[in-house]
């Protein structure tokens, strides 16, 4: 990867997009952005609050606006929210403005990684199990992730460092 192209990380919640993104940006000396953190920084409230007050539609509008602004930058690593790919406009922009890396993970891994986090609005369910919600999200979203991915990384039990260096190796051959 001779010139610094934008790198966009997509995938479901709990896949490790933010963690991998931060480490990848550091290794490549690139600027890192997390779309959820950018929304929180600009609004002064957390994502859960936005979901409670504005609903998912209100949140998605904010997310689309912020991602559209961020991807106009050059030489960045962006960790997107799991549902950002629901927008055709965002999918098209990500595809045309950088390398899209899909961090693929199982529902079982998501359950382990998200069980202690009470800040995930889509997992605040009453009569439905979290596993059922994650399975439904995977059913609808995984084909969208796959449709725009330039590179797919199966997240497994490898260390963060090993995954980051594997991604860098793939990017060098891209």
From Swiss-Prot:
Free-text comment on the cofactor: Binds 1 Mg(2+) ion per subunit.
Protein known as: Shikimate kinase
Role of this protein: Catalyzes the specific phosphorylation of the 3-hydroxyl group of shikimic acid using ATP as a cosubstrate.
Top-rank taxon: Bacteria
Enzyme class per UniProt: transferase
Cofactor requirements of the protein: Mg(2+)
Signal peptide: none
Biological processes annotated in GO: amino acid biosynthetic process; aromatic amino acid family biosynthetic process; chorismate biosynthetic process
Pathway: Metabolic intermediate biosynthesis; chorismate biosynthesis; chorismate from D-erythrose 4-phosphate and phosphoenolpyruvate: step 5/7
Organism: Buchnera aphidicola subsp. Baizongia pistaciae (strain Bp)
Database matches in PROSITE patterns: SHIKIMATE_KINASE
Catalyses which reaction(s): shikimate + ATP = 3-phosphoshikimate + ADP + H(+)
Compartments, as annotated in UniProt: Cytoplasm
Residues that hold Mg(2+) according to the record: 18
Quaternary structure and interacting proteins, as annotated: Monomer.
Cellular component, GO, one term: cytosol
Keyword field: Amino-acid biosynthesis, Aromatic amino acid biosynthesis, ATP-binding, Cytoplasm, Kinase, Magnesium, Metal-binding, Nucleotide-binding, Transferase
Family, similarity comment: Belongs to the shikimate kinase family.
Binding site for substrate: 36, 60, 82, 141
NCBIfam families found in the cross-reference section: PRK05057.1 (NF003456)
Enzyme Commission no: 2.7.1.71
């Amino acid at each position: 990867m001779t010139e610094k192209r934008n790198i966009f990380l997509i995938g479901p919640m709990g896949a490790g997009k933010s963690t991998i993104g931060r480490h990848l940006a550091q290794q490549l000396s690139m600027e890192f952005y997390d779309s959820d953190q950018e929304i929180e920084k600009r609004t002064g409230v957390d994502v859960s609050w936005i979901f409670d007050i504005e609903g998912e539609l209100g949140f998605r509008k904010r997310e689309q606006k912020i991602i559209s602004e961020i991807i106009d930058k050059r030489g960045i690593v962006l960790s997107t929210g799991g549902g950002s790919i629901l927008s055709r406009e965002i999918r098209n922009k990500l595809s045309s403005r950088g390398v899209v890396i899909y961090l693929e993970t199982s529902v079982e891994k998501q359950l382990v990684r998200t069980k202690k986090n009470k800040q995930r609005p889509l997992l605040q369910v009453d009569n439905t199990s979290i596993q059922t919600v994650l399975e439904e999200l995977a059913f609808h979203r995984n084909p969208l992730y796959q449709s725009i991915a330039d590179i797919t990384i199966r997240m497994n039990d490898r260390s963060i460092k090993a995954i980051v260096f594997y991604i860098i190796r793939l990017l060098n051959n891209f």
